[in-house]
Amino acid sequence: MFCFQCQEAAKNEGCTIKGVCGKDDVVANLQDLLIYTIKGLCYVCDKGNYLDDEVMDYIPKALFVTITNVNFDDKDVINWIKKGVALREKIIEKNNLNKEELPYCATWAYETDEDLINLANTKEVSVLAEDNEDIRSLKELITYGIKGIGAYLSHAMHLGYNNEDIHKFIIKAFTKIVDSKDADELFNLAMETGKYAVETLALLDKANTETYGHPEITEVNLGVRDRPGILISGHDLKDLEQLLEQSKDAGVDIYTHCEMLPAHYYPFFKKYEHFVGNYGGSWPFQREEFEKFNGPIVMTTNCLVPPKDSYKDRVYVTNEVGYPGLKRIPVKEDGTKDFSEVIEHAKKCKPPTPLENGKIVGGFAHNQVLALADKVIEAVKSGKIRKFVVMAGCDGRHKTREYYTEFAKKLPKDTVILTCGCAKYRFIKLDLGDIDGIPRVLDAGQCNDSYSLVKIALALKDAFGLNDVNELPIAYNISWYEQKAVTVLLALLYLGVKNIVLGPTLPAFLSPNVTKVLVEKFGISTISTVDEDIKRLVG
């Protein structure tokens, strides 16, 4: 195996024996084969000028399977590969494509599962198939950006929202990745990936807000009640809606975990009296927190950490999430999910063990912040707010991420943190006070709500009469972990945001030459020390 798609790649070079995430070499290689399968499928769709509902349903979900901490189940990944090959063959036949004119990724065949495992173990389908380090780096940058697009698109489609142009871009992009060896063409494609990342984030924002209302300032309880509970983690709001509706008279409470916390900010969910609070923190600490929760846990998406045996029988998965031995939520013929087993399981469990008390405040997405625009603008003009610091993105296991807690603590009192994603857990529970009633930590929501931060920045640019978003008193100190963060980064670069500090390390998949170009064009850098970074970002 060779995998360097996440921030925790071994030695910041790549995992070669087992993933730091927990996936073994078989699953890692099969995920490479799944991406190879998607490339072949996209290639035949492009050559046949073909797109239908089945393709649009399959590709985003299959991409989601390969994101870090989503699927660890070799049998599940094999099934996704088989679906892709069957769909590819159907399109070849339907469009009378000549296989002799197609690349191997669009023509390979298999007879047994063992054939798939053997093919997955070859260089041909791996990241290392591209020998040129810079071309490989650009292709992987685009691929990881598209993986995130696929994930966000899946969420939007789950709510009934879609955009065919995004699907057409994915097909075109993977076709170019197969064909192109031109660094300039691939760099431009990476920037175009940023464009479609923005469109996808906008689509998901529309899906979430039109379905559940605009997030509003909300206090979220961190304590527990004395009833059994169900803990829901991941990102999928539709799953939460179904779980809440099915459990409302069951005598159990529903708690969010990690990236599901922002669900409390949406008006729609406030009607459920048994939707009581958030339990725990970010995903790296789930093994201890899940054990203490005592009740069942529903994983709707990433991030799943390989579970301990002590609570493995309480973990349920749905959507693209997979791990050997975990129970899967049944899906009915009409597409809705049946959470009855989870609910009955919860009734037999003890209430959650308390982890902490108190409350946190969030809900500062674009609509809410722009409603406070006059107050914010006045605070900036009067000098009470000197700078906004975007501290968005992902959390992770590395001890180096303690940097973000210290950075938040040491920021001058006239600065305001704009955040979203699970990176927030490094500082959202700190008492950092407020500026004239404006909290010094404004949480916009999930990682995809980085779109809110962009909308806020663009609105402030217009309000201050500036020509360039980089003229705003906003600094960017972003932490990344998995591929959706790459999608967000490309979106920011496409929008022209410069001087982003990306940490705690730069991606292992960026070659020295590609890194140099990103530094020269966009001023990207990584973290140093807290004091030095506050000096350069805030002054």
Swiss-Prot record:
GO molecular function per UniProt: 4 iron, 4 sulfur cluster binding; hydroxylamine reductase activity; metal ion binding; peroxidase activity
Alphabetized UniProt keyword annotations: 4Fe-4S, Cytoplasm, Iron, Iron-sulfur, Metal-binding, Oxidoreductase
One of the record's GO cellular component terms: cytoplasm
EC number per UniProt: 1.7.99.1
UniProt subcellular location: Cytoplasm
GO biological process terms held by the UniProt record: nitric oxide catabolic process; response to hydrogen peroxide
Modification sites for Cysteine persulfide: 394
Catalytic activity: A + NH4(+) + H2O = hydroxylamine + AH2 + H(+)
SUPFAM superfamilies: Prismane protein-like
Cofactor: [4Fe-4S] cluster; hybrid [4Fe-2O-2S] cluster
Domain of life: Archaea
Residues involved in [4Fe-4S] cluster binding: 3, 6, 15, 21
Enzyme class: oxidoreductase
UniProt-annotated binding residues for hybrid [4Fe-2O-2S] cluster: 235, 259, 303, 394, 422, 447, 482, 484
The record's free-text note on cofactor binding: Binds 1 [4Fe-4S] cluster. Binds 1 hybrid [4Fe-2O-2S] cluster.
Stated family: Belongs to the HCP family.
Physiological role: Catalyzes the reduction of hydroxylamine to form NH(3) and H(2)O.
Record PANTHER family: HYDROXYLAMINE REDUCTASE (PTHR30109:SF0)
Name assigned to this protein: Hydroxylamine reductase
Upper classification of the organism: Archaea, Methanobacteriati, Methanobacteriota, Methanomada group, Methanococci
